[in-house]
Design a protein with these regions (language model features):
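Short hydrophobic alpha-helical segments that form membrane-spanning helices or hydrophobic packing faces
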Residues: 18-19, 45, 324, 421-425
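Catalytic or ion-coupling anion/metal-binding cores of large enzyme and transporter domains
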Residues: 170-194, 226-232, 250, 269, ...
Length: 446
C-alpha cells in the first residue's frame, strides 16, 4: 500500500506528481521533494484518480488554490441545484470542491457530485455520522464505518476534527461566539455527555490507516477556530493548533498526506502571526484557511472581508483559501453567491501570488494590460478572471455609446471618446515614434 507521500519519500515521481508539475510549470523533482517533506499535498483518492480526477497540488511552491463549499441543508435539498453550484464554481476557477451536505440522501448526493467533479473533492465525515441520529448515539464504530465508506466512494480529502480535546472546552467559555465549527460543536457535546476524550483523537491511528489505504488527504479541522474578531488568536485556538501539530506528524508517519485548517475571523494585524505560528507548530504542512474575515460587521459582503484577509494569509503562508460567499452568516448560498465567492477568493489568491513573486504569476496580468493598452477588447475580455461578467459589462457599455462592433470600439462609456486615455496614449505614441503597438515584450515585466 503506497500513497503520494510514501512514494515521494521513496524517491518515486508518480503520474499525479508529473501532472501537477506540468500544470504548474514546475519541475517534477520539486513536486516530489516538497511532497516528501510534507509541505505539499496532492489530494487524490485512488478511486477518484482512476476515474475523472485531474490531480492538483497544494503548497507554497505552487499557485494559491481556492476551494468552494457547496451542499444541501434540511431546508433546501436538491442534487441538481448543487451540481449547478459546483459547475458555476468550476467555471470561474475553483480548484477544489467540498460537499457539506446535511440534508437528504447524503450518499446519493456525494456519489452524484463526485461523478461530475474533475477536481479534488472533500467532505466532513462527522456530518454524516450525526445525520439522522442524536449526538449521544454516536459510537466509535459508526465513525470508522462512515469514514471508510466515504473513502471507498472516492473522496479526496476529509476534514477531521481530531484536535478538539476535552481539556480545551473550558477555554471557550469566555468567548463571544464560543464554538462556531459545526463539527467542533457536535464533538464538544459528545465529550461533555460521556465525559470522555474526543473519539477522533483516540482513534486517530485507526483513521490514518483507513485513509492511507485510499490515499485520502487529511484536512485537520480547526474545531475551535475563532468565529468573531474578539475571539481571534485566543488560548483555545492556539491550544488546538498545538494538538494539530502533533497529529500532523502522527498522520505523516503513517503515510498520510496532511494539510491543516485555520481561522476564521482574524483582524488584519494578527494574520501574519497566525500564518507563521501555524507553519512552525505544524511543521510546514499546507495551511487551509476560511477567509480569514477581517471584520464582523459586513453581512452580505463577507466575500470581500474574506478576500482582504485571504490575500494577506496567502502572502504570509497559507496555500489554500476556502471561499466565503456574500450570503455567509445569512443563509445557504445560491449559484450567483457561489460565483461571487469564488471570484473574490481567486482575486485574493492571485494578488498574493503576484506579491510573493511566484513564477509566472504576472504573465496573465501583462497580457491583459497589453491588450488594454492596444484597445484589444477581445483579448482584454478573454484574459480576465471572469470573462462572462467582463463581456456582459462591455456589451452594456457598447450599447450605451452606440458601438455596433463590440471589439473595435476605441473608447468606452467611462471616459467617452474625447477623454479616453488609452486612445489618447496611442495617438501620443504614434506622434513620438511612428505607429507602434505595445506587445508583451515592449518593456520588462516588474
Amino acid at each position: 500500500m503506497t500513497t503520494q507521500l510514501t512514494d515521494a519519500k521513496a524517491g518515486v515521481i508518480t503520474e499525479a506528481m508529473r501532472r501537477v508539475a506540468e500544470s504548474e510549470g514546475q519541475g517534477a523533482d520539486l513536486i516530489r521533494d516538497e511532497t516528501a517533506a510534507g509541505r505539499l499535498v496532492i489530494p487524490a483518492n485512488k478511486v477518484h484518480l482512476n476515474d475523472n480526477l485531474q490531480p492538483a497540488g497544494i503548497g507554497r511552491v505552487l499557485r494559491t488554490k481556492v476551494n468552494a463549499n457547496i451542499g444541501t441543508s434540511s431546508v433546501r435539498c436538491s442534487v441538481q441545484a448543487e451540481i449547478e453550484k459546483m459547475e458555476a464554481a468550476l467555471a470561474v476557477g475553483a480548484d477544489a470542491i467540498m460537499d457539506l451536505s446535511t440534508g437528504g440522501d447524503l450518499d446519493a448526493i456525494r456519489v452524484e457530485l463526485l461523478a461530475h467533479c474533475p477536481v479534488p473533492f472533500g467532505t466532513v465525515p462527522i456530518y454524516q455520522v450525526i445525520e439522522g441520529r442524536q449526538v449521544e448515539d454516536v459510537t466509535r464504530d459508526i465513525i470508522l464505518r462512515t469514514i471508510e465508506k466515504q473513502a471507498k466512494q472516492g473522496v479526496d480529502f476529509f476534514t477531521i476534527h481530531a484536535g478538539v480535546l476535552r481539556e480545551h472546552l473550558p477555554l471557550v467559555e469566555k468567548r463571544v461566539m464560543g464554538i462556531v465549527s459545526r463539527g467542533g460543536a457536535l464533538l464538544a457535546k459528545w465529550m461533555l455527555h460521556y465525559d470522555q476524550q474526543n473519539p477522533l483523537y483516540e482513534m486517530f491511528d485507526e483513521i490514518c490507516d483507513l485513509m492511507a489505504e485510499y490515499d485520502v488527504c487529511f484536512s485537520l479541522g480547526d474545531g475551535l477556530r475563532p468565529g468573531a474578531i474578539a475571539d481571534a488568536t485566543d488560548e483555545a485556538q492556539i491550544a488546538e493548533l498545538r494538538t494539530l501539530g502533533e497529529l500532523t506528524q502522527r498522520a505523516q508517519e503513517r503515510g498520510c498526506q496532511v494539510m491543516v485548517e485555520g481561522p476564521g475571523h482574524v483582524p488584519f494585524h494578527q494574520i501574519q502571526y497566525n500564518m507563521e505560528i501555524q507553519q512552525k507548530i505544524c511543521h510546514g504542512a499546507p495551511f487551509y484557511v476560511l477567509g480569514p474575515l477581517v471584520t464582523d460587521i459586513a453581512p452580505g459582503y463577507d466575500h470581500i472581508t474574506s478576500a482582504i484577509g485571504g490575500c494577506a494569509a496567502a502572502f504570509y503562508g497559507a496555500s489554500f483559501l476556502c471561499y466565503v460567499t456574500p450570503r455567509e452568516h445569512l443563509g445557504l448560498p445560491n449559484t450567483d453567491d457561489v460565483r461571487a465567492g469564488v471570484v473574490a477568493a481567486k482575486i485574493a489568491a492571485h494578488a498574493a501570488d503576484l506579491a510573493r513573486g511566484l513564477k509566472g504569476a504576472a504573465t496573465r496580468d501583462r497580457e491583459l494590460s497589453v491588450a488594454r493598452s492596444n484597445l484589444d477588447w477581445k483579448t482584454h475580455l478573454a484574459t480576465s478572471l471572469d470573462p462572462q461578467t467582463a463581456d456582459r459589462m462591455h456589451r452594456e457599455a457598447c450599447q450605451e455609446i452606440g458601438a455596433t462592433e463590440l471589439h473595435s470600439a476605441d473608447y468606452c462609456s467611462m471616459c467617452g471618446q474625447h477623454w479616453c486615455s488609452a486612445r489618447i496614449n496611442r495617438e501620443v505614441r504614434e506622434a513620438l515614434g511612428g505607429r507602434r503597438t505595445v506587445t508583451s515584450s515592449s518593456s520588462p515585466a516588474r
